C-alpha cells in the first residue's frame, strides 16, 4: 500500500480496496490470531483513509463473510455448510461474484464519497 499511496498522491487521486473479513468486525471462538490480523487490516484501512482523504485517495476494505470458495469447501464439511447458511439472515452463503460486485462499486464513481469504510459482504452475518 505504501508504494501505491506515493503514486496516487502524486496523481492526486486513487482508490485502494483492502481485503479484510467479517471477522474484522466481530469474533469467532478459536480464531483469535486470524481475528487479530483482520482487525489490524480494518484499523489500517480507516487510519490511512483519514490520512490520505485530502489527497483525493479513497481507501476502503471489503469484509466478506462465508463465501463459497475452495477454502470453504476444504475447511467446512458439506453437511455443515447448509447449517452455516441457515445462520445468515439471507439464508445462503456468499459467492465470489458477490464480493466482486462490491469491489466494482467501491472502485466506481458511484462511491465517490465513501472512504474509511469496512464494507460487509456477509449476508447480514455480522448484524446478528
Q: Where does each model-flagged region fall?
A:
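C-terminal substrate-recognition "lid" of short-chain dehydrogenase/reductases
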Residues: 1, 13, 92-126
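Alpha-helical segment proximal to the catalytic Tyr-Lys
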Residues: 6, 50-51, 112
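Short, flexible catalytic-loop segment of classical short-chain dehydrogenase/reductase
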Residues: 25, 42, 63-74
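Active-site helix of classical SDR
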Residues: 1, 37, 45
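Active-site loop immediately N-terminal to the catalytic Tyr-X3-Lys motif
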Residues: 26-32, 54-55, 91, 109
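Short, small/polar-rich loop/turn modules that mediate ligand/substrate recognition or access, typified
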Residues: 53, 58, 114-116
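A short helix-coil junction within the Rossmann-fold of NAD(P)-dependent oxidoreductases
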Residues: 3-15
